[in-house]
Amino acid sequence: MAIYAIGDIQGCYNELQQLLEKIRFDAAQDRLWLVGDLVNRGPDSLRVLRLVKSLGDRAITVLGNHDLHLLAVAAGEAELHRGDTLDEVLNAPDRDELLVWLRHQRLLYAEAGYVLVHAGLLPQWSVTQALGLAQEVEQALRGDDYAVFFEHMYGNSPHGWRDDHRGYKRLRVIANALTRMRICTPQGDMEFKFKGEVEKVPHGYLPWFDLPGRKSAEVTVIFGHWSALGLQVRGDVIALDT
C-alpha cells in the first residue's frame, strides 16, 4: 500500500487523471491525501468532486478556501466571483449529494506523524489543540444550520487567536488559519493579502511554518494554498501547491 499526497487540484480533472496514471494509483490498496481546493479555476470541478467522492475512504481530503467558497455560494451566503468556474457543480443533477459530501470533509487530518491541512497551523497551536479546533468548524459545517456559519465566515478579523474567542468570531479565526493563512507575526497575527515569494514577505511577518517555537514542529505538515512557494520538502513541512 502507498499513500500519495497531492496538492491543490482546483478543477483540473484531466491533469489529476494523468497524475494518477503516472503513479499507477490502485484504488484497491493505495490511498490519496488531498490538501483541499478540489474546485474552482480549472474547467472540471464537477468531475473532480465525483471522482474523489467515488474513492470513498481511499481518499482523504481536507477543505480549502475554494471548497468553502463553493459551499457558501450554494447556501446563498456568497456571490460568485469573476473567474469562478463553479456553475457546472451548482447546476449538476447530483449537486446536493456532492455538496453534502463536501460539507462533511475535514479541515485537518493527522496520522503517523503527518498532518494534512490546506493552509497552515497558527504557531501557538499544538496538533492536538488544532484538531480540536478544526472539529468545532467541522461540526458547524455538518449541522442543520450550516448556512449561518457561511453568513459569518467571510472577513479577516480577528487577525489572531485567543482562547477566549467565542461564537462565529472564534470559528472564523480557526477557518482562516486552516484554509487561508500564509504568513503571520511571531504572536500569530495573520495577514491575508500577501501571496508572493518568501523573499518578499513583509517586515514583521514570517511564513507560518518558519516561526520560532511553533508548537506543531514535531510533525510533518503537508499543505497547499501558497502557489508561490512551489514544491518544498523538508522535515517539518511539505508544500504541494505547485
Q: Where is each model-derived feature located?
A:
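Acidic, glycine-rich loop-and-strand cores that form catalytic or ligand-binding grooves
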Residues: R166-V201
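Conserved beta-sheet core of the metallophosphoesterase superfamily
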Residues: W125, A130-E138, K200-T242
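Active-site-proximal beta-strand elements of phosphoester/diester hydrolases
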Residues: A2-Q10, Y114-G120, I238-L240
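N-terminal active-site segment of His-dependent metallophosphoesterases
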Residues: M1-L55, L68
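Active-site neighborhood of phospho(di)ester-bond hydrolases with catalytic His/Asp-centered motifs
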Residues: I6-G7, W33-G36, T61-G64, V221-G224, ...
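Active-site neighborhood of divalent metal-dependent phosphoester bond hydrolases
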Residues: L46-L49, S54-K169
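Short, basic, glycine/proline-bearing loop/turn elements
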Residues: R31-G36, E79-L90, M190-E197
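Short, conserved active-site loop motifs that form the nucleotide-linked donor/cofactor pocket
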Residues: I3, D30, A59, Y114, ...
